[in-house]
Amino acid sequence: MAGLYVARQLTKHGLRVAVVESGSARPVGGADDLNEISDEHGCYQWPVTGRARGMGGSSTVWGGKMIPLSPADLTARPHVDAPAWPLGHDELYQGLGEIEALFRLDGGAYEEGAPPHFRTGVKLPQGDTDFSVRWAKWARFRRGDMWRILKDQLANHPLAHIWTDATVSEFTVDRWSRRLLSIHCDDGAGHALDVQAEHFVLAAGTLESTRLLLLLDRCGEGRIFSSCDALGHYFQDHLDAPVGRLVVRDPDRFDRLLAPRYRGLQRRSPHIELTDTAQRDERVASAFVHMTADLSQNETLGTIKRLGKRLEESDYQGLLTELQKSRLAPRSLGRLVARRLYHHTLFMPGDVAFNLRVCIEQAPRHENRIRLGDARDRLGMPKVELKWRPSDIDERTFRSCVDRFSAFWQRQGLDRICGIEWLAHTRPGASIVEAAQDYAHPSGTARMGTDARQSVVDGDLLCHHVANLSVVGAACFPSSGSANPSLTIMLLAWRAARAIASAMTRPAAQVHVPAASREAANV
């Protein structure tokens, strides 16, 4: 998603761009064998199906949750070996208004305190020492797909050239000037593409971007990143675990307390996170608590959800079919409408099971790493070899969050609205980490920083070791905090595009594709 946005921004500055996509014009459902990796410990769950190749990449499959990192997430946290970001909070969020407009998000605040237009009559606690409540925004289905958003602006743009089914397989580097001269791409069917440019941007997701950087180093005989101790290291992901079941005691107040809020079509949801003070006291990383429910268990809500999806997809035949076979319960439908129109919340029926989960930031560790393995993919390229596993500090973060949340829930009197039945693995002596899985938010292996030995890119996403290469994505995160990464990725894309555009002085002359090159599928 970041690469398409950078391309759009550069064309707006009169710069010619070539977009090279490893996947097809649209991501194909199911697993892509090019995403397969070698996993030394067998711990990582989502390397194949948790990411998508194709125009728009993983933006075609993500849920749409957008929330900033907290100011504390960007600071040095020596108790978990997390370095400071090379950007202050205000610097990082300079492009926030533009990114929110791109996804058609409202301009309301994310910070603690329910937005004033919600008339719920029930408020989550504020000012607690252990937990703060922020408010995430959700992109609608049609506005979460980056290719859907930008296709009209890029597909026929005179300065944009787009190639699909073109996987980078070789780099040509001038080792003396440390400049990238060209890339060579293959599609596995005998077609090849060579691109020369003044500046290159790598925005292929954490796993693939890191693999390509390691391949670039190999093409440079191991000399390009020889002085860098960070490339491929500090692989991390959010870890998510079920911790309890909610027992609703006051249904009316429950859905007005925890249900998603709406303003028009804009969805907001509470993001309950461990405070910086609690983290320092316990010497643990960030974490947040969230509720999940399968609303399709309720016939009325399941029908409404399917109808809404058909409508957003402009699938009017499917919409008609759903209407013909639907059976909407008048009472549930009436409460749903009343909740949305008056309280601006989603009606949460009593026949749906609600689960409590904790999602933690994994502490960065040098030994968790990506390297090029001996196994090859169908294009003959080395697969990612991952050495990664959770650590003791991750278990402590889970346990600290669970223990403090239990006390918080009772201290604030929320157990009178709904109780919590804690699962067995949350008890003393058990392991929460063993019940957890990665959250498909990989990051950290090309981290930002000011020291070229300890980081791969600087605060403008420019590679310390290759003069004309930018890397954009969660791979550049020094730490992941307790926020979904998509908003931060897009803010970094905004920053990188601005820096590149400022540095480029010769418009419409920066990309050269040799005439002899052949593309597999030119969009």
Regions picked out by a protein language model, each given a short descriptive name:
Residues 1-19:
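N-terminal Rossmann-like FAD-binding beta1-loop-alpha1 element of flavoenzymes
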Residues 12, 25-26, 48, 171, ...:
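Glycine-rich loop(s) and the adjacent beta-strand/alpha-helix scaffold that form part
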Residues 36-112, 363-374, 378:
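Redox-cofactor-proximal catalytic regions of oxidoreductases
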